[in-house]
Amino acid sequence: MSGQVPEYQFWLLAEISPVHSEKVINALRDYLVMGYNRMEACGRHGVSPGYFSGALKRFQRVSQTVYRLVPFYFPEAGHEVHRGE
């Protein structure tokens, strides 16, 4: 996933994510958008690797939730709608 997220998509996800620390968001951007490895991204912004991993999981959870919401807004997208899990 490193370096594979478009910048605009990243900022939209950041807007609705539970991650609020500017330095953590910048480290996530370096990793997800710019393609830095985890250690480089953490070092550039003074974020501990453990905290970064937790923030990355929360960020990925937001992305997965948005993906699951798509069929409710765009039924033609072809995703199967599951009502509850």
UniProtKB/Swiss-Prot annotation:
Keyword terms, alphabetized: Activator, Fimbrium biogenesis, Transcription, Transcription regulation
GO annotation terms (biological process): regulation of DNA-templated transcription
Pfam families: PapB
Taxonomy, superkingdom: Bacteria
Keyword Repressor listed: no
InterPro entries membership: Adhesin_operon_reg_prot, Fimbrial_Adhesin_Reg
Known function: Regulates the transcription of genes involved in the biosynthesis of F1845 fimbrial adhesin.
Name listed for the protein in its UniProt record: F1845 adhesin operon regulatory protein
Native organism: Escherichia coli
Gene: daaA
